[in-house]
Swiss-Prot record:
Protein name: Ephrin type-A receptor 10
Gene: Epha10
Catalytic activity, reaction form: L-tyrosyl-[protein] + ATP = O-phospho-L-tyrosyl-[protein] + ADP + H(+)
InterPro entries in the cross-refs: Eph_TM (IPR027936), Ephrin_rcpt_lig-bd_dom (IPR001090), Ephrin_rcpt_TKs (IPR050449), FN3_dom (IPR003961), FN3_sf (IPR036116), Galactose-bd-like_sf (IPR008979), Ig-like_fold (IPR013783), Kinase-like_dom_sf (IPR011009)
Domain SAM: start-end pairs: 932-996
Residues that carry a glycan: 311, 486
TM stretches of this protein: 566-586
C-alpha cells in the first residue's frame, strides 16, 4: 500500500509511542456466549490491504502485541490541516449465519489541547460506517462517500492521551463495541471516516453471538445463531444422546437468547432400558444389574435368586428351579413352587356320605404368599392295583371348590358307597406350572366307603308308569363286604319335585322291585333308593342318585279310577266361577271420596268391585330363610358370569363396587345393566346381607321398582345385576335441571312412585330408607324406587350429624327416631319428604339444620313450608303424611289416588308468595331472642369452617346473629369475600338462620 513520501513528524510523535503502550495491554473478553469471529485484524500478520482515500490519510503500520507477535494497525493524524475527510474501507466480510453483528474497536486518541497550533482543526472523534453487499467490492473500486454506507456511530474516546502521558509511558487504550443489523445480504464492508483526529486504530474485531453446542438433560443441542431482535428466542429441538429416549409428549428443547445464552429448557431425555445416566452420557448397566424402564434413573441390583450376565440388561433371569409369575414385576424376587401340604387328615360321614379333608400348609411356600390348593379325586377298584384308578368325574362335588382353594379344608360329596377313592391335595402358587396339580408336590389319602346302594341313575328301570302308580326295579348289589342278597332290604324315598325334601314318603321292600301307588296324575316325582341289612345300619347308608318320573294325566274324565284330588280341583274351580258371577251382580257404583265428604262435579264415576282374585304376593323376609343362597334362586335368575361385561365403575356400594355394564343373554339383544359386586374379604354377615338384598329385590315386579335381571352366585365375585337407570339418583338429577322442569312435570313423577309404595305396602314390605337419593331416573323421566339393601331388623341410624351431612332424621318419622319403630306409616312420612324434595328440585330437607335441631323442631310441631310453585293441595297432602300420630296418616293407596287426580287437573293452584320457600321479607321487626346452635357470629362462622371472615363481618358492623340473619346477597358481596364457594356457603348459612327465625316465631307450618 502506498504510504506517501514519508510520515508526518507530529503523527509519529503522537501515535507510535501510545500504540506500543496499548499493545502491552491485551484485551480481555469475558462472557459465556460463544462468539463467531468474522474479522480480527490482530490475527493477520501480513498487510491488511484495506482501501484508504485519500492516500495521505489513513496509513497502515506494523507493531507487536504483548506476546511479541507482529500485528498490523492503521493511524491518521492530520490535525493541523482543516477540512479533513479521510476514509478507510475494510475488505469484504461474509456474515455467515449471523444477522446481528458486533463490531469491537480498540484505538488511542490524542487530546487536541495537548497539540500546539491545532486549535480549530483538531477533532477528538471519528465515524464508523458499514455497507451491505452481495459480493466483494474489490480493493481498486472503493465506494466511499455519498449516501450508500450506513453510519454505525460517531466514536469518541473515553480517555485521550497528552504529551505528559507520552513521557510517563501511560497507556490510554479505548475499547468500543457497536452493533449492526439485522443484515440480509451475504456480507458487508466496514468504513472509518477521519474528520481531523489524531487516532490510531489498533484492532478491529467483527463477530456474531451464538449459543454454544451443549448437552443438557441428556439431549444434544447444536450451536445456534442468536436472532437479530433482542427479545426473540430461537426454539431449538434437542437430540437424545446415544442409548436415551425422550418423552413423545414433551420432546427436549431449549431456547437460544439474543445474547447467546441458552434459556427455558423444556423436557429431557432418559436413558433407555439397560442404561443409566453418567454425566452427559448413558452407560450400560454392568453385569448383576438391570434397568427395566427409562423411567428409572439408575440400574438396580438383580433381585434374589436371579442374575444378569451381560451388560445393558433390561431384566434378570431366574436361577434354575426358580421362576416368576406372569403377574410379577421384574423387580420381584424369583420364587419356586411350594412343597406338598402337611398332615393331610380325613373323616368320613355316612349320612350323607361325605369325605371331609383338612391339612396344614406346606413347609416351604416357595417364597410366595399366594399359595392355593387343588384337589384331584380318583376312583379305584376295590381289589385292583392303584394304577387302575380313574378320575371321579362330574358326579363328585367339591365344597367349597375343587381348585383355587385358600382354605385348608374341603368336603367331597356324592361319593359312591362300597367304593375306594384316592384324593390328592396339591399345593400351588403363582409359579406352579399348569400340570403342577398332578405333579409330585401333593399329599394323598385313600379311603374306602361303606356298603350301600351302588346304582347309577340308568341302572334303575322304570318298568311301568301310570297316572297314579309307578313301578321300578334294579339289580341286586353284590359288592364284596356288602350285605348278602338274602338279608338285604331296600328303602325307597319319593316326593313331588319342587316340594321340600323334608316332606317325603318311604316304602321298604325285600325284593329289588317296587310299585308305588296313590300318586297324583300329571305330576313329576323324585325317587331315591338305598340298600342295607335290617337293623341300625339303615342310618349309615346313602341313597342312590335321584331319578325323576312324570306320571301321565287321566285318559278320560269319567274314568272310575278318578282320584279324589281331581274331584276337589273341579269342585273348587266351579265354586270360584259361581262366586265371581255373584260378585259381578253385586258390584256397586260409587264416587271416590275427596276427604271432605263432598264429591267433585268433574270427577268421573268409577266402578269398584269388592271381589278380587287372590293373586297378591306376600313378602318373604330373607332373615326367615335358613340358607339365603338357596332361597335367592326361588326369585332370581342365575346368570352366567360370562354374560355380564363390566364397563366402568359408578362408585362404591355397601358391600363392594357399583358398576355399569352389559348383559348379553342368548337370543336377546345386549342390555345395559347396573352390577353390584361383593368385594373380596367380606364377612359372612355381609355376604348374607348381600344375598338378602337380591332376595328382596327379586320378589318385586312393578314398573316403578328397579328390576332385578339376575344374580351370579356360582362365580367370583358374587353379583347382583339390575336394570341400568342412566340419569342417576333423583335428587342429583333435579339439582342439575333446576329451572328446566315446570311444576306439572315434577308432579308427574309422583304418582308412579306412590304406586310402587302402594305395591310394597300391600306385600307387607317396609322400605325404611325412602329418600329422593334412593329413587333412580332413566330416559323419559321414568322414576323407580331402589335402595332395598337395608335389613328388616336394622336399628335406626344415628341422627346426630354435621350440618352438611345426610342425617336420617331428615326423612325419618318421629316414632322411628324415638323408638326405632318402622311401619308402612313411617314410610308414608318419608314419602312426604320425597314429595317435598321433588318440588324443591332436590334441595336438602330442613336446609342446613342439624339432625338434632330437626328432631327438636319436628317434635315442637314444625313442618316444612311449601316449595316455590308448589300447589297448595299437594302441600296439604305432605302435611297429612307428616301427622305425628301414625294412624292419622293416609295409606299409600289413598296417596296414589290423590296424586293421580292432581295430575289430571289443568292448572294446579300455586302457593302464595308469602309462604313460599326462603321468604324474602325482611326480618328486622321480628324478635330474635336466641339461637340454640350458636352463641355468636364467631361460633356460627366456626360451624361453617369460615372463621377467617370474622374480621370482615365485624368491620362491616355485623356483630350479632340478628344482623347476620337480615343480610342479603348484595350485603355479603360488600364484605370483600372473593371466593365464590365461600360466598355460597355463607349464603346457605344465612338462609339457615332465617329458617330458624321462622321456626322460633311460628312462621313455619305447625301441625
Amino acid at each position: 500500500m502506498e504510504t506517501g513520501a514519508g510520515p508526518h513528524p507530529l503523527r509519529l510523535f503522537v501515535c507510535l509511542i501510545p500504540l506500543c503502550l496499548a499493545l502491552l495491554l491485551g484485551p480481555g473478553r469475558p462472557g459465556t456466549a460463544e462468539e463467531v469471529i468474522l474479522l480480527d485484524s490482530k490475527a493477520s500478520q501480513a498487510e491488511l490491504g484495506w482501501t484508504a482515500l485519500p492516500s495521505t490519510g489513513w496509513e497502515e503500520i506494523s507493531g507487536v502485541d504483548e506476546h511479541d507477535r507482529p500485528i498490523r494497525t492503521y493511524q491518521v493524524c492530520n490535525v493541523l490541516e482543516p477540512n479533513q475527510d479521510n476514509w478507510l474501507q475494510t475488505g469484504w466480510i461474509s456474515r455467515g449465519r449471523g444477522q446481528r453483528i458486533f463490531v469491537e474497536l480498540q484505538f488511542t486518541l490524542r487530546d487536541c489541547s495537548s497539540i500546539p497550533g491545532a486549535t480549530g482543526t483538531c477533532k477528538e472523534t471519528f465515524n464508523a460506517y458499514y455497507l451491505e453487499t452481495e459480493t466483494d467490492l474489490g480493493r481498486g473500486r472503493p465506494r466511499l462517500g455519498g449516501n450508500r454506507p450506513r453510519k454505525i456511530d460517531t466514536i469518541a474516546a473515553d480517555e485521550s492521551f497528552t504529551q505528559g502521558d507520552l513521557g510517563e509511558r501511560k497507556m490510554k487504550l479505548n475499547t468500543e463495541v457497536r452493533e449492526i443489523g439485522p443484515l440480509s445480504r451475504q456480507g458487508f464492508h466496514l468504513a472509518f471516516q477521519d474528520v481531523g483526529a489524531c487516532v490510531a486504530l489498533v484492532s478491529v474485531r467483527v463477530y456474531y453471538k451464538q449459543c454454544r453446542a451443549t448437552v443438557r438433560g441428556l439431549a444434544a443441542f447444536p450451536a445456534t445463531a442468536a436472532e437479530s431482535a433482542f427479545s426473540t428466542l430461537v426454539e431449538v429441538a434437542g437430540t437424545c444422546v446415544a442409548h436415551s429416549e425422550g418423552e413423545p409428549s414433551s420432546p427436549p428443547r431449549m431456547h437460544c437468547g439474543a445474547d447467546g445464552e441458552w434459556l427455558v429448557p423444556v423436557g429431557r431425555c432418559s436413558c433407555s432400558a439397560g442404561f443409566q445416566e453418567h454425566g452427559d452420557i448413558c452407560e450400560a448397566c454392568p453385569p448383576g444389574f438391570y434397568k427395566v424402564s427409562p423411567r428409572r434413573p439408575l440400574c438396580s441390583p438383580c433381585p434374589e435368586h436371579s442374575l444378569a450376565l451381560e451388560n445393558a440388561s433390561t431384566f434378570c433371569v431366574c436361577q434354575d428351579t426358580y421362576a416368576r409369575s406372569p403377574t410379577d414385576p421384574p423387580s420381584a424376587s424369583c420364587t419356586r413352587p411350594p412343597s406338598a401340604p402337611r398332615d393331610l387328615q380325613y373323616s368320613l360321614s355316612r349320612s350323607p356320605l361325605a369325605l371331609r379333608l383338612r391339612w396344614l400348609p406346606p413347609a416351604d411356600s416357595g417364597g410366595r404368599s399366594d399359595v392355593t390348593y387343588s384337589l384331584l379325586c380318583l376312583r379305584c377298584g376295590r381289589d385292583g392295583p392303584a394304577g387302575a384308578c380313574q378320575p371321579c368325574g362330574p358326579r363328585v362335588a367339591f365344597v367349597p371348590r375343587q381348585a383355587g382353594l385358600r382354605e385348608r379344608a374341603a368336603t367331597l360329596l356324592h361319593l359312591r358307597p362300597g367304593a375306594r377313592y384316592t384324593v390328592r391335595v396339591a399345593a400351588l402358587n403363582g409359579v406352579s406350572g399348569p400340570a403342577a396339580a398332578a405333579g409330585a408336590t401333593y399329599a394323598q389319602v385313600t379311603v374306602s366307603t361303606g356298603p350301600g346302594a351302588p346304582w347309577e341313575e340308568d341302572e334303575i328301570r322304570r318298568d311301568r308308569v301310570e297316572p297314579q302308580s309307578v313301578s321300578l326295579s334294579w339289580r341286586e348289589p353284590v359288592p364284596a363286604g356288602a350285605p348278602g342278597t338274602n338279608s338285604t332290604e331296600y328303602e325307597i324315598r319319593y316326593y313331588e319335585k319342587g316340594q321340600s325334601e323334608q316332606t317325603y314318603s318311604t316304602v321298604k321292600t325285600g325284593a329289588p322291585a317296587v310299585t308305588v301307588t296313590n300318586l297324583k296324575p300329571a305330576t313329576r316325582y323324585v325317587f331315591q333308593i338305598r340298600a342295607a341289612s335290617p337293623g341300625p345300619l339303615w342310618e349309615a347308608q346313602s341313597f342312590s342318585p335321584s331319578i325323576e318320573v312324570q306320571t301321565p294325566g287321566e285318559v278320560a274324565p269319567g274314568s272310575r279310577d278318578q282320584s279324589p284330588a281331581v274331584v276337589v280341583t273341579v269342585v273348587t274351580i266351579s265354586a270360584l266361577l259361581v262366586l265371581g258371577s255373584v260378585m259381578s251382580v253385586l258390584a256397586i257404583w260409587r264416587r271416590p271420596c275427596d276427604g271432605k265428604g263432598s264429591g267433585n262435579a268433574h270427577d268421573e264415576e268409577e266402578l269398584y268391585f269388592h271381589f278380587k282374585v287372590p293373586t297378591r304376593r306376600t313378602f318373604l323376609d330373607p332373615q326367615s330363610c335358613g340358607d339365603p343362597l338357596q332361597a335367592v334362586h326361588l326369585f332370581a335368575k342365575e346368570l352366567d358370569a360370562k354374560s355380564v361385561t363390566l364397563e366402568k365403575s359408578l362408585g362404591a356400594g355397601r358391600f363392594g363396587t357399583l358398576c355399569c355394564g352389559c348383559l348379553q343373554l342368548p337370543g336377546r339383544q345386549e342390555l345395559p345393566v347396573a352390577v353390584h359386586t361383593l368385594r373380596d374379604g367380606c364377612s359372612d354377615s355381609q355376604r348374607l346381607s348381600f344375598l338378602a338384598e337380591a332376595l328382596t329385590l327379586g320378589q318385586f315386579d312393578h314398573s316403578h321398582i328397579v328390576r332385578l335381571e339376575g344374580v351370579v352366585t356360582r362365580g367370583n365375585p358374587l353379583m347382583i345385576v339390575t336394570e341400568y337407570m342412566n340419569l342417576g339418583a333423583l335428587d342429583d338429577f333435579l339439582r342439575h335441571h333446576e329451572g328446566e322442569l315446570v311444576a306439572a312435570q315434577l308432579m308427574g313423577l309422583l304418582p308412579g312412585l306412590a304406586s310402587a309404595m302402594k305395591y310394597l305396602s300391600e306385600m307387607g314390605y317396609v322400605h325404611r330408607g325412602l329418600a329422593a337419593r334412593r329413587v333412580l331416573v332413566s330416559s323419559g323421566l321414568l322414576c323407580k324406587i331402589s335402595g332395598f339393601g337395608r335389613g328388616p331388623r336394622d336399628r335406626a341410624e344415628a341422627v346426630y350429624t354435621t350440618m352438611s351431612g345426610r342425617s336420617p332424621a331428615l326423612w325419618a318419622a318421629p316414632e322411628t327416631l324415638q323408638f326405632g319403630h318402622f311401619s308402612s306409616a313411617s314410610d308414608v312420612w318419608s314419602f312426604g319428604i320425597v314429595m317435598w324434595e321433588v318440588m324443591a328440585f332436590g334441595e336438602r330437607p330442613y336446609w342446613d339444620m342439624s339432625g338434632q335441631d330437626v328432631i327438636k323442631a319436628v317434635e315442637d310441631g314444625f313442618r316444612l313450608p311449601p316449595p316455590r310453585n308448589c300447589p297448595s293441595q299437594l302441600h296439604r297432602l305432605m302435611l297429612e303424611c307428616w301427622q305425628k300420630d301414625p294412624s292419622e296418616r293416609p295409606r299409600f293407596s289413598q296417596i296414589h289416588s290423590i296424586l293421580s287426580k292432581m295430575g289430571q287437573e289443568p292448572e294446579p293452584s300455586k302457593c302464595a308468595s308469602t309462604t313460599c320457600l326462603r321468604p324474602p321479607t325482611p326480618l328486622a321487626d321480628r324478635a330474635f331472642s336466641t339461637f340454640p346452635s350458636f352463641g355468636s357470629v364467631g361460633a356460627w362462622l366456626e360451624a361453617l369452617d369460615l372463621c377467617r371472615y370474622k374480621d370482615n363481618f365485624s368491620a362491616a358492623g355485623y356483630g350479632s346473629l340478628e344482623a347476620v340473619a337480615e343480610m342479603t346477597a348484595q350485603d355479603l358481596g360488600s364484605l370483600g369475600i372473593s371466593s365464590t364457594e365461600h360466598r355460597e356457603s355463607l349464603l346457605s348459612g344465612i338462609s339457615a338462620l332465617q329458617t330458624r327465625v321462622l321456626q322460633l316465631q311460628g312462621q313455619g307450618v305447625q301441625v
